[in-house]
Design a protein with these regions (language model features):
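Proteins enriched for Cys/Gly/acidic motifs involved in redox and nucleic-acid/cofactor modification
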Residues: 1-158
Length: 158
């Protein structure tokens, strides 16, 4: 059975472009896009900290995923919850303190390691890592959604 991921993106067009690049990286590593969060082995929340309403929505979604993660039975691996983006960068420790169900918090400059970290924590059941690195997330190529007539192209970061 293939490992499946689900990505939720909040905020700016930069996050949309980076989520598209994250999808490519995950698919290169053998992951498949889930049809719903309920069937995902890993859920990634690509977060924004610009507006309080975005943060409030993300806190709510973390509660939803905590509950969903607790519903998985022994027949299926537990869902892994990953938080990345500006909110992860700014509030990483608060996120893991408030929601111990979060398995991985990834700052803005370590996103290129998400696929390899998921390879480690999904099969082993290990979790609770925080990745920080002073490197830019590099896009291997730009990804446009199937059937889309446009794609976001980042021109700066931060």
């Amino acid at each position: 059975m293939a490992k499946k991921y689900w990505i939720e993106t909040y905020g700016c067009q930069m996050n949309v472009a980076e989520s598209d690049a994250l999808e490519l990286e995950l698919e290169k590593s053998g992951w498949e896009h889930a049809q719903s969060p309920e069937e995902a082995h890993a859920v990634l929340l690509h977060t924004c900290s610009v507006r309080q309403t975005a943060e409030d929505r993300i806190w709510g979604r973390l509660g939803f995923y905590k509950h969903l993660k607790g519903q998985h039975d022994g027949e299926r691996q537990k869902m892994r919850i990953v938080v990345t983006g500006c909110m992860a960068e700014r509030l990483g420790e608060q996120i893991t303190d408030t929601y111990p169900s979060v398995d991985l918090v990834v700052g803005n400059f370590a996103k290129q390691h998400i696929a390899e970290e998921l390879e480690r924590i999904v099969p082993s059941g290990e979790g609770r890592a925080r990745l920080e690195e002073n490197d830019s997330f590099e896009f291997s190529r730009f990804h446009s959604r199937e059937g889309a007539h446009h794609a976001y192209v980042p021109i700066m970061h931060g």
